[in-house]
């Protein structure tokens, strides 16, 4: 009887170890983390986060006209026609899961155009403070969030702002491409970085 109990306990122990290994392997293949060390947050995960607390999503603007051979939309300091298409596609996918949000951009042509094409008619508020990319960006985010504490916020800003936030909040090296984004939230007066937004 004692031998049977020992054998049974060993079997259970091995089973638990196998389950743990399977879980670890599953996490490894799920690509839950970006190569830069930031958690990856897709549309569905973002929607679940938004049910827990309002989210703040910061996007880099779409493709710049002055750094591309693609056709410009209009002003050379703005975005390309391809950039408008990419912004509209991103906006459609985003709005399908997060339909209710306030929209902001810094006061440059490229961020304003990106936000406009992303939103498909939603009211846009331009705020020059969103061009400041040191600690000032946190004050700007908290100020916007305090105006409507229960609303999600989308901000169109610049790559150096996103790079600064990732390094400052999580010591991560983040070099955002056009329309890459970060997900944040404000809690008890503090701004937290949740991860990198991945559109799929």
Swiss-Prot record:
Q: Please report any disulfide bonds recorded for this protein chain, giving both cysteine positions.
A: none
Q: Which GO terms describe its molecular function?
A: phosphatase activity
Q: Name one Pfam family in it.
A: His_Phos_1
Chief localization class?
periplasm
What Gene3D superfamilies does the entry give?
Answer: Phosphoglycerate mutase-like
Where located? Periplasm
Question: What UniProt keywords are attached to this protein's entry?
Answer: Hydrolase, Periplasm, Signal
Chain segments annotated as coiled-coil in the UniProt record: none
**EC category:** hydrolase
Lyase is among the record's keywords: no
Pathway membership? Bacterial outer membrane biogenesis; lipopolysaccharide metabolism
One cellular component term (GO) for this entry is:
periplasmic space
User: Biological process GO annotation list?
Assistant: lipopolysaccharide metabolic process
Q: What is its EC number?
A: 3.1.3.-
Q: Where is the signal peptide?
A: 1-25
Q: What family does the entry list?
A: Belongs to the phosphoglycerate mutase family. Ais subfamily.
Task: Provide the function of this protein.
Answer: Catalyzes the dephosphorylation of heptose(II) of the outer membrane lipopolysaccharide core.
**NCBIfam families reported in the protein's UniProt record:** PRK15416.1
Q: What is this protein called?
A: Lipopolysaccharide core heptose(II)-phosphate phosphatase
